[in-house]
């Protein structure tokens, strides 16, 4: 039953026993944000007039793609309609988490801010890989799990079948699985009651030194960085000076409060509360997700565990189509970094593409989202080079190189090359096992194990090199399984591999933008494919142009762009053969001279078409 604002406890004076912190975990598109909308309406924190679908997804790109990228936190008052706490107003802090594999670190920090989680599964599709990955994270954090089937209003829903699957997975009875429809609102009040009943209240020491964990931070152009925190011990008050424990930086709390869902200032926030703080800092990197905040006076000495710096896994070069946009691109990346602490970049130049940046991302969706935001919010036209991963190269003389750009791959005597590997989990209907295994074996995968979740759904676990996933692995997986498979992966370290750098030479000159690091067994196929593609794209010159793919000094593939022939004999009608020969010899001389000094210009669209389609990566794409 919605609580009236008059009896909602103040954030600084709420008894921790009345607080419930929970989050919702689900696969993309299983209705998480819609369920959040219904909760906002039911608890009465958002006025009916201002309600809109996916209320918590603020970014345009989140709304368009139907995904949640940034975590959001909302304080919901709720008085249970039944049970021993009937009529007593509780405070529910709901944290909406991203569902995508690239943002797993954000999810894990959000989970650490909760005591319970609502595991949401689509009643028409069942458990997917992402759900499993996030469920394991929740179990690692010892959260109480409330299983829920959503979309029971769909004609294709099979609540009985999937509630059994869910019950087997988390070890409860099928009748304990709640059935709701976030769209129509059926069963959502029962879900809120269950959260109050099952999720434990936060435990913390009210009079200990303050300790709060940052689980998200966003940049607001007017107020600077807004940091979302969960208070574990003690209390944070307005105008107090605080200290970040990982960096030792100190700030003054200009504003403190809770979001319900608009920001509502308060005097302070106490044990177990989830709220926001504003310190006037302008850079998100100073309030790092997972860091601990404490008071400057009588502060805590031990930080809360679990903080780590997000490490970029995938690198790509971003270049403006128009060289004069370079300063705008720098400014745009600076602004994006304010909001996205996981983004790293450094300037680089390419002989072929001019000035640009080498940008590091958490994964492919992150790359896609950043690129789209740059193009949409800042109006830039970009070329992105093919994504690549970070290699560690050990030379025979004992030196070590970390390579983020294929053109920096060292020449000379290499002892070992280490590449990152991931543990991938694929969930799919069992009829596609053969196709999935064939795809993974082709990508240098090693099978770890296989489990049947039910008689027709199987979970397959593989170790795969990250480099094999970053191109079109996901597209291939979807097309081989008619869209039914779902994929999740997590980094598990690195392995040594027989990798080589393939260079593309045009007329004997290396084109750095086309260099790629690939496995020795696939280097030949890669070279042949790229060379054949370039031959179609490079316009014919007045002299012939060899296009070669080479590993070191050894050429492995070659195509030739034929010269344009000018008919020099057009003006000779009949006449002496020696006259014609003289003209032909003269033409031959000229061609030879041109070939010596000639320069081959690669047209811009040739770059775009080679780099933007991932045909260079997977054999399957070229055959479509």
Curated annotation (Swiss-Prot):
User: Which residues of this UniProt protein bind GTP?
Assistant: 29-34, 150-153
A single Gene Ontology biological process assigned to it is: positive regulation of translation
**Which Pfam family, an example, fits this chain?**
GTP_EFTU
Membrane topology per the record? Answer: Peripheral membrane protein
**What Enzyme Commission number(s) does the record list for this chain?**
3.6.5.n1
Carries keyword GTP-binding?
yes
Xref: SUPFAM superfamilies: EF-G C-terminal domain-like (SSF54980), P-loop containing nucleoside triphosphate hydrolases (SSF52540), Translation proteins (SSF50447)
* Residue ranges annotated for the tr-type G domain, each copy included: 17-203
Q: Name one GO molecular function term.
A: GTP binding
Note the superkingdom of the native organism. Bacteria
Task performed by this protein: Required for accurate and efficient protein synthesis under certain stress conditions. May act as a fidelity factor of the translation reaction, by catalyzing a one-codon backward translocation of tRNAs on improperly translocated ribosomes. Back-translocation proceeds from a post-translocation (POST) complex to a pre-translocation (PRE) complex, thus giving elongation factor G a second chance to translocate the tRNAs correctly. Binds to ribosomes in a GTP-dependent manner.
Q: Which protein, by its recorded name, is this?
A: Elongation factor 4
What organism, scientifically named, is this protein from? Streptomyces griseus subsp. griseus (strain JCM 4626 / CBS 651.72 / NBRC 13350 / KCC S-0626 / ISP 5235)
């Amino acid at each position: 039953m919605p609580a009236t604002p008059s009896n909602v406890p103040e954030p600084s004076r709420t008894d921790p026993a009345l607080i419930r912190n929970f989050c919702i975990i689900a696969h993309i598109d299983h209705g998480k944000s819609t369920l959040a909308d219904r909760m906002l309406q039911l608890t009465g924190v958002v006025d009916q007039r201002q309600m809109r679908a996916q209320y918590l997804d603020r970014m345009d790109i989140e709304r368009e793609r139907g995904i949640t990228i940034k975590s959001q936190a909302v304080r919901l008052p709720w008085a249970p309609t039944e049970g021993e706490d009937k009529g007593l107003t509780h405070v529910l802090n709901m944290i909406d988490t991203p569902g995508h594999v690239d943002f797993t670190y954000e999810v894990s920090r959000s989970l650490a801010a909760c005591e319970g989680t609502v595991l949401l599964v689509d009643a028409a599709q069942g458990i997917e890989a992402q759900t499993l990955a996030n469920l394991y994270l929740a179990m690692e954090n010892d959260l109480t799990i409330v299983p829920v089937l959503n979309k029971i209003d769909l004609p294709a829903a099979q609540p009985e079948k999937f509630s059994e699957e869910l019950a087997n997975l988390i070890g409860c009875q099928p009748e304990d699985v709640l059935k709701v429809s976030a769209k129509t609102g059926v069963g959502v009040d029962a879900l809120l009651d269950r959260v109050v009943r099952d999720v434990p209240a936060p435990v913390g020491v009210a009079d200990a030194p303050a300790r709060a964990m940052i689980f998200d931070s966003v940049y607001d152009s007017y107020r600077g960085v807004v940091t979302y925190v969960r208070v574990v011990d003690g209390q944070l008050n307005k105008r107090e000076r605080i200290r970040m424990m990982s960096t030792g930086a100190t700030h003054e709390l200009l504003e403190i409060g809770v979001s319900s869902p608009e920001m509502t200032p308060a005097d302070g926030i106490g044990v177990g509360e989830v709220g926001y703080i504003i310190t006037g800092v302008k850079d998100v990197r100073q309030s790092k997700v997972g860091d601990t905040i404490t008071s400057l006076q009588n502060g805590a000495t031990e930080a809360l565990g679990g903080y780590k710096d997000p490490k970029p896994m995938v690198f790509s070069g971003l270049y403006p189509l128009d060289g004069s946009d370079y300063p705008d691109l720098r400014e745009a990346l600076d602004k994006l970094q304010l909001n996205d602490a996981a983004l790293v970049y450094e300037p680089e130049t390419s002989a072929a593409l001019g000035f640009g940046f080498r940008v590091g991302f958490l994964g492919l969706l992150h790359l896609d989202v950043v690129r789209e935001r740059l193009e949409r919010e800042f109006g830039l036209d970009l070329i992105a080079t093919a994504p690549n991963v970070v290699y560690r190269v050990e030379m025979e003389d004992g030196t070590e190189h970390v390579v983020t750009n294929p053109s920096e791959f060292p020449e000379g005597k290499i002892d070992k090359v280490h590449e990152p590997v991931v543990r991938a989990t694929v969930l799919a209907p069992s009829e596609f096992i053969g196709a999935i295994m064939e795809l993974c074996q082709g990508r240098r995968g090693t099978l770890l194990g296989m489990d049947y979740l039910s008689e027709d759904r199987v979970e397959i676990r593989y170790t795969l090199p990250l480099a094999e996933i970053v191109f079109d692995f996901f597209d291939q997986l979807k097309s081989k399984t008619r869209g039914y498979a779902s994929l999740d992966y997590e980094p598990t370290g690195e392995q040594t591999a027989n990798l080589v750098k393939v260079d593309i030479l045009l007329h004997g000159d290396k084109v750095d933008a086309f260099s790629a690091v690939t496995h020795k067994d696939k280097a030949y196929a890669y070279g042949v494919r790229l060379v054949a593609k370039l031959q179609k794209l490079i316009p014919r010159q007045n002299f012939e142009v060899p296009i070669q793919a080479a590993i070191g000094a050894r050429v492995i593939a070659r195509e030739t762009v034929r010269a344009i022939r000018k008919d020099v004999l057009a003006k000779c009608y009949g006449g002496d053969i020696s006259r014609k020969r003289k003209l032909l010899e003269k033409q031959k001389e000229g061609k030879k001279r041109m070939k010596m000094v000639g320069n081959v210009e690669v047209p811009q669209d040739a770059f775009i078409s080679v780099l933007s389609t991932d045909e260079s990566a997977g054999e399957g794409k070229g055959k479509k």
